[in-house]
Regions:
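A mature extracytoplasmic/lumenal domain signature
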Residues: 10-15, 50-54, 82, 202, ...
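Assembly/oligomerization interface modules of large self-assembling protein complexes
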Residues: 1, 39, 68-71, 78, ...
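Envelope-exposed proteins and targeting segments
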Residues: 4-7, 42-46, 96, 222
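Conserved catalytic cores of soluble enzyme domains
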Residues: 50-189, 216
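Phosphate-binding active sites in nucleotide-utilizing proteins
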Residues: 15-16, 21-52, 57-58, 62
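Intrinsic disorder and flexible/low-complexity segments
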Residues: 3-5, 10-22, 26-35, 158, ...
Length: 256
């Protein structure tokens, strides 16, 4: 029996910061899992199964960097599920090959920022108001007052910087001119068929196709076994995770 393995690592859910398990992709947790297979000499190739609408830019970048380190040691193939958009594409774009179903929703190469405001809700609903004493005009920036023009401009600069990073990663990972990436970016969503024509993915197919490509790139022939890297929740955790995944899938389908 061959000791050579192809590891399947699942990235399923919204991408969030930190560590944890459940219906989301926790950036540090997934990065640690990828580091684990990178250090395992029995694992000769990795299939990263991505089914995500995106999420945190920071967590996406943490995962992207670990994918880059993994690629230095062994082939990494991405298999896209129903959707791999925004951060889902961010963590995919550096792989050695990307496989998407024809109906996969992908791309959405874009960045946005949100800033919660509670001032009106607290004042109008609860009668709560706040006064502030501050050392400078932005010291009390938060949910209790509107952003100033300077603060809004600073947040916009941060969004622009993340967008520039995202598009440069796509250009480098997909070997595309940056000008072409900018033409197809801007948050636009593409089907797997369109993504293939645009160069955002390498072929249309499912998980079996991705495994076959991984075996070929690692020169394994048919002498390998598949290992699934999962830490599945049990009991109520399994029920709740499945329920939340269904809710998020319905929301994404409605938005896209």
């Amino acid at each position: 029996i061959s000791s050579s393995q192809i590891a399947i690592v699942y990235a399923d859910g919204a991408i969030v910061d930190g560590e944890g398990y459940g219906a989301d992709i926790y950036g540090n947790t997934l990065a640690a899992k990828l580091a684990k297979v990178r250090r395992n000499d029995d694992v000769k190739a990795v299939v990263l199964r991505v089914n995500s609408p995106g999420g945190s830019a920071l967590a996406s970048d943490v995962i992207w960097r670990e994918v880059e380190l993994l690629r230095e040691k062994k082939p990494v193939i991405v298999s896209m599920g129903s959707y791999a958009a925004s951060g889902g594409y961010y963590i995919s774009c550096g792989a050695d090959a990307i496989v998407a179903d024809k109906t996969t929703l992908t791309g959405s190469i874009g960045v946005f920022g949100m800033f919660l405001r509670l001032e009106d809700a607290l004042k109008n609903k609860l009668g709560i108001t706040f006064d502030a004493v501050r050392t400078n005009t932005s010291a009390d920036m938060g949910v209790m007052r509107p952003l100033t023009g300077t603060e809004r401009a600073a947040i916009m600069r941060s969004v622009d910087e993340v967008y520039e990073t995202f598009t440069s990663y796509v250009a480098e990972g997909r070997n595309l001119p940056l000008e072409k990436v900018l033409d197809i970016a801007g948050g636009r969503v593409w089907s797997g068929t369109d993504a293939l024509a645009l160069g955002l993915v390498d072929t249309n197919g499912g998980l079996k196709t991705a495994i076959a490509i991984a075996a070929d790139k690692a020169e394994l022939g048919d002498k390998f076994r598949i290992v699934e890297m999962t830490e599945a929740p049990t009991g109520f955790g399994a029920f709740f995770s499945g329920f939340m995944a269904k809710v998020k899938a319905d929301i994404v389908a409605g938005e896209l």
